[in-house]
Amino acid sequence: MRGTPYYYNGDELGMTNPGFTKITDYRDMPTLNVYKHLIATGGDIKQFMKRIQFSCRDNSRTPFQWNSSANGGFTTGTPWIGVNPNYKTINEAAEDKDPNSVLNYFRKLVQLRKENLTL
């Protein structure tokens, strides 16, 4: 039986977590609620901010990075959540040109799967 590979928006580029450092950069309500609770109870905010750089759902919600223009080419307006600061180097336009990029590796894997019924 064939498996079903899946990847989320940005995986094909190797997009990374944005590394937001301010709570105002986040939009995820459970994260914001825990932050408010920690403030109210004297929790360790510094440790919490480090942890959410890896665990918050907003890490997978940043705009897709199409190119190196403002907002990664995602919009000419203001995105609802900030663009990853690395959009100038990790973006679809740059990776499309690089035969050794993560994007082109994904393309090779997709082609391999199409050509091989066992996969």
Regions found by a protein language model. Give the residues of each.
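Loop/helix patches that line or flank the sugar-binding groove of alpha-linked glycan CAZymes
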Residues: 1-119
